[in-house]
Every structure is written in C-alpha cells, then in structure tokens.
UniProtKB/Swiss-Prot annotation:
Lineage: Bacteria, Bacillati, Mycoplasmatota, Mollicutes, Acholeplasmatales
Domain of life, source organism: Bacteria
One term of GO molecular function: translation elongation factor activity
Subcellular location: Cytoplasm
GO biological process, one term: peptide biosynthetic process
Gene expressing this chain: efp
UniProt keyword list: Cytoplasm, Elongation factor, Protein biosynthesis
Family according to the record: Belongs to the elongation factor P family.
Name used for this protein in its record: Elongation factor P
Role description: Involved in peptide bond synthesis. Stimulates efficient translation and peptide-bond synthesis on native or reconstituted 70S ribosomes in vitro. Probably functions indirectly by altering the affinity of the ribosome for aminoacyl-tRNA, thus increasing their reactivity as acceptors for peptidyl transferase.
Length: 188
C-alpha cells in the first residue's frame, strides 16, 4: 500500500480492479477544506487515460510490473511471436494488445515487454528512436519544390511518413516512435 502523498510519476497502482500508471499528479491544498491529489492515470490494459481525484493521505495498492527484453521473430495470424532474450522462452502477443506499435516492428528488433504478475502481458515499449530503411519514395521535380518541402516515404516496416525532399530510396533514417515523425538521416 502507498499513500497518495507519496505518489510518483511512473508508479503503477491498482485502483477500481484495474492497473493504472501515474502519468501526472498535483497535490492541491485549498484554503478551506481537506487537501487532495489530482491525478492523470493511464489504464495499462486499455491504454485509455482518465483524470481522478484522491483524498490526501488515503492508501492505494501498489502494483508491481516487470519489464523484460524480448526480440521480435515473426507473425502467425493475429499473434506476434517474440523470444525472451534472458531465457529463450517464446512469447505470443495478440495483435490487439500492441496494435499501435505494429508499424514499427521488424524482424530482430529488441523491445521491452511489460508483464504483471509474471503472466499477464500488458504492452510492449519500443525504443524512442529507430533506424529504418526507406523502401519507396515519391519523385518530386525541382519545379515543385516551392510548394512541397516534404514527401511521402514508405519504410521497411510498411509505415508511411513525411520526409524531406533530399531523402532517397535505400537510405536509412531515424524515426521517433512516440510521434511517428522523421528525425534525421542515419549516419551508420
């Protein structure tokens, strides 16, 4: 159990029979009345974010989650197959659990898996930035440069993003997985 006075960003709590990660919190001490803690909580099972207010000093159950390094192997229907790097155990994750991260997965990528109670897989965490190869890009003529500063590029994972005009097919670029935006050329 943890007091609401001891909340920290990133902690995981059990509340209303669900697992929530504390995204942000604010201790409020009004001039009149009892103090309270206003929180923004992310449901780890659904991904939704809620706002909640706790009375100051009440106890909430702390949930312990594990993170393990896993490597993506292949797709089998609606299941994505990974291997745990530590013990070489094969892990199957349903497509719906990682639906918004599928567009960044390629064979061999290493990600963190978030597990509750050693059996319930909640999510995967991608690296903040990935080096990906451009497999297809539009050709833009020089006369169109005044209007188009970015063009579409298809990456090796199938993801389509906007890139600067100088990026060509076959080049490696860095993509931010949080925003889905082009960062820079890859120097490697």
């Amino acid at each position: 159990m943890i007091s609401t006075n001891d909340f920290k960003t990133g902690q995981t709590i059990k509340f209303n029979n669900n697992l929530f990660q504390i995204v942000s919190f604010l201790h409020v001490k009004p001039g009149k009345g009892a103090a309270f803690v206003r929180c923004k909580l992310k449901n780890l099972r659904t991904g939704s974010i809620i706002d909640n207010t706790f009375n100051s000093g009440i106890k909430v159950e702390l949930a312990f989650i594990n993170k393990n390094k896993i490597q993506f192997l292949y797709i089998d229907g609606n299941k994505y197959i990974f291997i745990n790097i530590a013990n070489y155990e094969q892990i199957e994750i349903e497509k719906q659990k990682i639906k918004n991260k599928i567009k960044y997965l390629y064979e061999g990528i290493i990600v963190d898996v978030v597990i509750y109670n050693d059996y319930e897989i909640l999510d995967i965490n991608l690296p903040e930035k990935l080096n990906l190869t451009v497999t297809k890009t539009e050709f833009i003529e020089k006369k169109d440069v005044k209007t188009n500063y970015y063009k579409d590029a298809t990456l090796e994972t199938g993801l389509v993003i906007k890139v600067p005009l100088f990026i060509q097919q076959g080049e490696k670029i860095i993509v931010n997985t949080q925003t889905g935006l082009y960062v820079s050329r890859c120097n490697k």
